Regions:
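A detector of single, family-specific signature residues
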Residues: 1-239
Length: 241
């Protein structure tokens, strides 16, 4: 048998892939297979399908966007396999007919959506985009750490009955008040360590934000950033996300 295009639905998980094939001619999914979570297993599966559909068959593989990211996409396309990442909320087949969730059923739904074009593809970032995104995640991780240490300092003060009379926390006046506190014995050392961590993280975030401003001037991003900066209150680090 020779078919022009075979659509391969892939339900991907950390430990395993569930695969199936779908053709417009047959109007049904077939050749279900569960494999290890390895792109080479997908390549082996496609070779198996060639023995059924012929050497002239074209394969289009697809999987839902999720925690797996773009790794599988890049691995398959590097091996000249067309791959599409589907936006889950745009999959019409999933919305209307999905009932009992199983890996096999999910793979079938993905294959059908590919064949019937009932989906919108996810934008695939460039390698530079991904690097920048990881940089932003790292900056946000430090921001969360700063938020945590702020909470710890305020909790420490509350436990030891140090009450600030000013209106706002983390102003220059509040920081001056914190540094002027004189807890007894080891408590002083504890507060000093908290404040040192606070200052270190604050300085680092300021440095990272300056680096993000530099990245935003690159040709790939500067025009979009320039347009969005017209909105009041929108910062560069937010635009990048």
């Amino acid at each position: 048998m020779n078919y022009n295009t075979v659509y391969v639905g892939m339900d991907v998980h950390k430990e395993s892939f569930s695969l199936c094939a779908y053709t417009i001619e047959a109007e049904k999914a077939s050749h279900y297979q569960r494999t290890e979570a390895d792109y080479k297993k997908v390549l082996n599966y496609l070779e198996f399908l060639r023995t059924i559909y012929g050497d002239d068959a074209n394969f289009i593989c697809g999987y839902e966007a999720g925690c797996f990211g773009y790794t599988l996409y890049h691995q398959l396309t590097a091996n000249n396999v067309k791959c599409i990442i589907l936006a889950p909320t745009t999959m019409l087949e999933q919305r209307s007919k999905k009932r009992i969730k199983t890996d096999r059923r999910d793979a079938e739904i993905i294959a059908k959506c590919l064949a019937q074009h009932n989906y919108s593809p996810v934008h695939i970032p460039t390698a530079k985009d991904e690097e920048t995104k990881e940089f932003l995640r790292m900056r946000d991780d430090h921001k969360l750490a700063l938020k945590k240490v702020k909470q710890q300092i305020l909790a420490f003060c509350l436990r030891h009955n140090y009450r600030y009379d000013g209106k706002s926390h983390w102003t220059a006046a509040h920081l001056k008040w914190l540094k002027a506190l004189t807890p007894e014995a080891l408590y002083k050392e504890i507060l000093d360590e908290y404040l040192l961590t606070y200052q270190t993280l604050s300085d680092k975030i300021e440095r990272l934000d300056k680096r993000i401003e530099e990245l935003a001037t690159q040709d790939e991003y500067k025009e979009a950033v320039k347009k969005l900066c017209c909105f009041i209150g929108v910062k560069t680090c937010l635009l990048y996300t």
